[in-house]
Amino acid sequence: MLLLQDLMGDNCELEMISGGCDKETHRRRFRTKLIAMGMCGYDRVIVEPSGIYDVDEFFDVLHDEPLDKWYEIGNVVTIVDAKLESGLSEEADYLLASEAANAGSIILSRAEEATKEQIENTIEHLNRALEQVQCKRRLDREIMRKDGAELSEEDFDKILKSGYVAENYRKMELDEKKGFDSLYFMELKISADELKTQVAKMMQDPECGVIFRVKGFVKDDAGSWMQLNATGHEISMKPIGDGQEVVIVIGEQLKEDCIRKYLEN
């Protein structure tokens, strides 16, 4: 929400659906939000998930009454790390496949930082994940192999008209208690430098679980906001105009107590 504040105005509003709940509760909140927005007369709605997302929720809810009469699905765009890690679990590969199978276009984030070999390995990984869930689709022309800043008007027009693909694949029931999670840590009393150091340590500690990403905001010694973004490849801390005292940890089989020790001690 904070990163999208510049878009707000008379013709654009931002709404948020709270996470940290079970699957059915989140689906109900999503449906309720779409009904409320439909009654407000919006003519375009962009759904931007954060963290681990069940794609079936999106399609299932939009086929419920009365939403099936109010909304029409336009484009499904999937953003994939151009330097995608190779050693993902079966469950993680399933999520990767499910979030790519229906996409009309796929954008490789941080493509400018990746080598040609890394990009090709990522594309091979995507198609291998699709094959593992018995999906017949193979991705190639749908993939934007360039940095977001390099996208041309022609590229954006292609994305705008890319639509989506109603693809079939084998579903996997993910155990909510043992699977993927997003943990939120509010108002941490930690400096920007110390946060960066502690995040690097906990991402290497198997006792914390498998951490995919850590993101959030913290103030530096001068009282200015800094934005943290950490993956298995790198950890960055960059200035940002506004922020909120929150750190979000995304991963698989996360151990909150262990992670909290790094962030609070």
Residue ranges of model-derived segments:
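Short, conserved catalytic or adaptor-binding loops enriched in Gly and charged residues
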Residues: 4-9, 99, 133-137
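A short alpha->loop->secondary-structure connector
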Residues: 65-71, 96-98, 123-132
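Hydrophobic packing residues within well-ordered alpha-helices of enzyme cores
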Residues: 3-4, 58, 122, 126, ...
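C-terminal accessory "lid"/substrate-recognition subdomains
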Residues: 102-108, 113-242, 253-256, 264-265
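Short, well-ordered beta-strand elements
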Residues: 245-251
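Nucleotide-state-sensitive switch-loop elements of NTP-binding domains
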Residues: 1-89
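Flexible active-site lid/hinge loop adjacent to a nucleotide/diphosphate
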Residues: 86, 90-102
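Charged, alpha-helix-enriched surfaces in structured cytosolic catalytic cores
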Residues: 25-28, 53, 57, 71, ...
